[in-house]
Amino acid sequence: MPAEMKSAASGSDPRSSGERDKALNLVLGQIERNFGKGSIMRLGDASRMRVETISTGALTLDLALGGGYPKGRVVEIYGPESSGKTTLTLHAIAEVQKRGGVAAFVDAEHALDPVYAASLGVDVENLLVSQPDTGEMALEIVDQLVRSAAVDIVVIDSVAALTPRAEIEGEMGDLAVGSQARLMSQAMRKITGNIGKSGCTVIFLNQLRLKIGVTYGNPETTTGGNALKFYASVRLDIRRIQTLKKGTEEFGIRAKVKVAKNKVAPPFRIAEFDILFGRGISTLGCLLDLAEETGVVIRKGAWYSYEGDNIGQGRDNTITWMEENPEAAITIEQLVRQKLTEGSEVKANSMKPLAAAARTAAAAAPKATADEAAA
């Protein structure tokens, strides 16, 4: 059998390996000349193999997400009213600003409270804020901010408030079926590529609606059509599960977040944390929950103990002790991260889904977090 027929029968290319490499390098060079450097590359040549993240401000949620909000991706946070959606994004903005980053808030609902934002650690003096008149204006502003590659995080509050220009200019009662969905679909096609290139994290807040005529299954859906669901790398479903009280006085809520979609880490994890009125996410509360689950802090009855010494009776008193002893809290955080890196089992129902993602999350989280806190 001739050599050519043998090659064809075996399915191999008759050209030598050197010729194939030369042809490949030639076409790669041609593509880069036509479309710019970085338009095509080997995955192993990429400068960042692991997706960088932004802390959410809640250690339990960071673990559930595999480190935090991914950079250069679209994130959607949805849930009922007063469930903590805006609080989550303000904490993310504060974390970005702590590291010298630039943040923008597109306030389509015209409801941003600068006093509350400042109480959560947001540098309101340097926060970029836009209150657009139309949905088109809002999304065009987002696109220009992303294209600049000078902004680290952009928050849009909310998709439901992105009203198309035609609807605003029309009369009350005029039908505009599907106009917002078309607007979002066009915008996502346009800005998603730029988001990836710039490394900017774009977070959309969204509201819930009920589908009519659903007898079986979940009747809830989000506004703005299906485009955002597809383009988002992370989707978070946040719910208020408990109201926190001291006597008859309400001072916060217990929130539960389900990772409904995650393209950069295992999905369907669940995290719980406290949101205190006027103060935001209780970071020490998150730390205490994980410290108890990993065995760093032991609870017997109502008493919590650390290294054999009782540190507080009841959860609130223990958190107060941690506030008064910041060095001990830093040490506890270091021990918790070490335990999670080693793959410690997490026993409580609220934390079970985090155990399997612990190693991934600890590896993706910034290694200097505890050291920076100590400094």
Curated annotation (Swiss-Prot):
Entries under PROSITE patterns matching the protein: RECA_1, RECA_2, RECA_3
Keyword annotations from UniProtKB, A to Z: ATP-binding, Cytoplasm, DNA damage, DNA recombination, DNA repair, DNA-binding, Nucleotide-binding, SOS response
One Pfam family from the record: RecA_C
GO cellular component: cytosol
Annotated GO biological process: DNA recombination; DNA repair; SOS response
HAMAP family linked to this entry: RecA
Function in brief: Can catalyze the hydrolysis of ATP in the presence of single-stranded DNA, the ATP-dependent uptake of single-stranded DNA by duplex DNA, and the ATP-dependent hybridization of homologous single-stranded DNAs. It interacts with LexA causing its activation and leading to its autocatalytic cleavage.
Name of the protein in question: Protein RecA
